[in-house]
Amino acid sequence: MVEAALAEPDEVLNGYCRIEDEAAYRDPSVPKAVVAPDGRLLYMSRGPVPASKGGTFRMAWRQVCIYAFPRVALRAFAVHGVKSRLEDIEDIEILRFLEMGWTVRMVLLSDTSIPVDDPADVERVLAAIRSRGL
C-alpha cells in the first residue's frame, strides 16, 4: 500500500484480495468489492457481489481495510459530516468517497490478513500468531 500511495499520491486507495471460500462470500461481516479491470472500485457491499443469476459462488474480492488518502480527500470526507446514503445502509465508509464522486483505486494485497470485525475474530488472530511461534 505504501508503494501505491507513493506512486499515486492524489488517489484514494483501498486494499483488496481474493475471496477463496463461499462462506466468506456469503458472510455479511465481509465487505465484498466489485472492481473494474483498470482497478477502480465500482461498488462495495456486505451482500454477495458479484452474484450470478443462479446464486452460485464463482469468485469475488474482499476489502482489506488498509487505506491511503490524499489530504484533500480526507478533508472532503470530514466536511461531508454525516454518513452518505449507501455508507449508512452498508456500513462501509469507502462508499462515501464513491458517492461524493471520488475515484477509489483498489490495491491488490495478500490474502493472508485476518479481518477483525467482532470479538470472536480476535481468537483467530491470536491462533495465527501462536501458529507462527510469535
Regions found by a protein language model. Give the residues of each.
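Conserved alpha/beta core of the MobA/IspD/sugar-nucleotide pyrophosphorylase nucleotidyltransferase superfamily
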Residues: 56-134
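Conserved core of the sugar-phosphate nucleotidyltransferase
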Residues: 1-83
